Regions:
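Histidine-centered, transition-metal-coordinating active-site segments
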Residues: 1-31, 52-54, 71-81, 192-254
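Divalent metal-dependent catalytic cores for phosphoryl transfer on phosphate-bearing substrates
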Residues: 55-57, 63, 75, 87-215
Length: 254
C-alpha cells in the first residue's frame, strides 16, 4: 500500500484531531506539542517492518493508530452496552491509551527505530522492508512508549500505564501474570486494558486482511515437472558405482 503526500498529511491531521477532541487539558496541549514536534518522523513511520505484518509501509504507523482509536471507541461503547462497569473510565483514558500504545515504534527522541532496508534479497525473499536501528538500546515497544511519554513530562494514571504496558496481551509472555491470574485481587481493576488490546487486535487483523491476505498463494503456481528418470547412460554410471547386489537390482529395474 502506498500513500501520497496528501493522504499522509490527512491521516496525521486526523490523529491530531483526536487529541483535540478527546484529551483533556493539560495533557491535550502537551500531546499536541509532542506530536507536532515529531510530525516529520511519525508521518512516514511504518507500523511494522515486514510485509506480512500489518501496515508495513510509509505512513502505516499513523494509519494503524487512527484505526486503533476508532476501534477503541467502538469497543468502549460495546462494553458499556454489555453492562460493564465503566464508571472509572473516560473517553480521555481510552483515546490516550489508543493514541500512545505503539509510540515506542518511533525510536528515541533523536533516532528512528527503523530505516528502509537496502538489502534487496531480504526485501524480496523475506519481506523485510525495514531494518532495525541497532544504535538504540533494546526496549520492548510498550516500555519505550512509556519511556517517551515520561521523558516528555506527559503523565498518566496507573490504569493507563498498565494498559499501554500490556496492550499486546498474551502475544507477549511478560503479560502473562496480568492476563492469566487466578487470584481475583490480581485481575485488571478496570476493563481498559482489555478494550485497548481488543481494539489493537481488531485493527491489525483488518489491516492484514486488506493488505496481505489477497496476496497469499499468488506466487505459488505449480512449477513444470522435471524429468528425473534415468537414461541408459546415467543408469550404467550409477550401476557401476553400486556395490550392494540388492540396490543394484533395484536400480536396474528403474
Amino acid at each position: 500500500m502506498e500513500m501520497n503526500a496528501q493522504q499522509l498529511q490527512s491521516n496525521y491531521d486526523e490523529l491530531i484531531s483526536y487529541i483535540e477532541k478527546y484529551i483533556e487539558s493539560p495533557r491535550k496541549e502537551q500531546l499536541v506539542t509532542f506530536y507536532k514536534q515529531h510530525e516529520d518522523r511519525l508521518i512516514l513511520l511504518p507500523a511494522a517492518h515486514k510485509a506480512a505484518y500489518h501496515s508495513a509501509f510509509a505512513g502505516g504507523y499513523v494509519f494503524h493508530v487512527n484505526n486503533v482509536i476508532k476501534n477503541a471507541l467502538v469497543s468502549f461503547d460495546t462494553w458499556r452496552r454489555a453492562g460493564s462497569n465503566l464508571v472509572d473510565i473516560t473517553l480521555d483514558n481510552v483515546v490516550f491509551c489508543a493514541l500512545n500504545h505503539d509510540l515506542g515504534k518511533m525510536g528515541s527522541k533523536d533516532e528512528d527505530a527503523v530505516y528502509p532496508s537496502q538489502d534487496k534479497w531480504r526485501r524480496e525473499n523475506l519481506g523485510e522492508l525495514y531494518k532495525f536501528n541497532t544504535n538504540l538500546a533494546y526496549m520492548s515497544v510498550p516500555d519505550r512508549s512509556l519511556f517517551l511519554l515520561q521523558e516528555a513530562g506527559i503523565g498518566m494514571s496507573q490504569d493507563e500505564f498498565i494498559t499501554i504496558k500490556t496492550h499486546d496481551g498474551l502475544y507477549d509472555e511478560a503479560n502473562t501474570p496480568y492476563f492469566k491470574s487466578f487470584i481475583p485481587e490480581n485481575r485488571f481493576r478496570t476493563p481498559l486494558p482489555l478494550i485497548i488490546h481488543e481494539a489493537d487486535m481488531r485493527a491489525a487483523r483488518i489491516e492484514w486482511e486488506q493488505q496481505y491476505l489477497p496476496t497469499i498463494g499468488k506466487g505459488n503456481l505449480a512449477k513444470p515437472k522435471v524429468n528425473r528418470s534415468f537414461n541408459s547412460n546415467n543408469k550404467s554410471k550409477a550401476l557401476s558405482s553400486v556395490k550392494s547386489a540388492g540396490l543394484k537390482n533395484m536400480l536396474d529395474n528403474l
